[in-house]
C-alpha cells in the first residue's frame, strides 16, 4: 500500500523490489537448511558421527531435493552477487556463518575448543559445498560419499 503499486505488482508485496525478494529468499533458504542441519546433527551425540551422518543423508536425498526444492542455491546466488550487490552478498555471508556455527556448536559439545570448532565449522561447510557442487556436476553422489568418509577419517585421526 505504501508503495502505491498495484496489488498484483511485486512492489506491492516487496516495496524494495527484486533485491528485497532475493534477500528474503536467501534468508528463508538459510533458515530451512539450518533447521535441517540441526536436526541431522542431533542424530548422534558424537560430532564426527553426526557430521558424517549428515553428509550421507544429504547425498542420499540430494537429487530428489534438487528436483523438488523450493529453496534457492546459495552457492549460485553468492557466486553471482559477490561483486555486484553488497546487500545480497552480505545476506549470503550471514547464512553461511549461521550454518558454520551449527557445526561449530556441535563440535564444542564434543569437547573441541571454541576457536578450533569455529575453524572446523568453516572447513566442514566448505567441504560440503564443494562436494555438493561436484556431485551435481557429475550427476553422482560419489563426491558427497567421499566427503563423508574422509571427514570421518580426519576426525578419527584427531582422537
Predicted regions and their residues:
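Short helix-capping/turn signature of helix-turn-helix
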Residues: 14, 76-83
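Amphipathic alpha-helical packing segments from all-alpha helical-bundle domains
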Residues: 34, 49, 68-71, 83-109, ...
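Amphipathic C-terminal alpha-helical segment
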Residues: 61-65, 83-84, 105, 125-142, ...
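Hydrophobic alpha-helical connector segments
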Residues: 24-27, 37-70, 120-124
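Hydrophobic alpha-helical segments that form the core
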Residues: 75-76, 115-134, 150-153
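Short, charged helix-capping/linker segments at alpha-helix termini
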Residues: 45, 111-118
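Helix-turn-helix
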Residues: 1-24
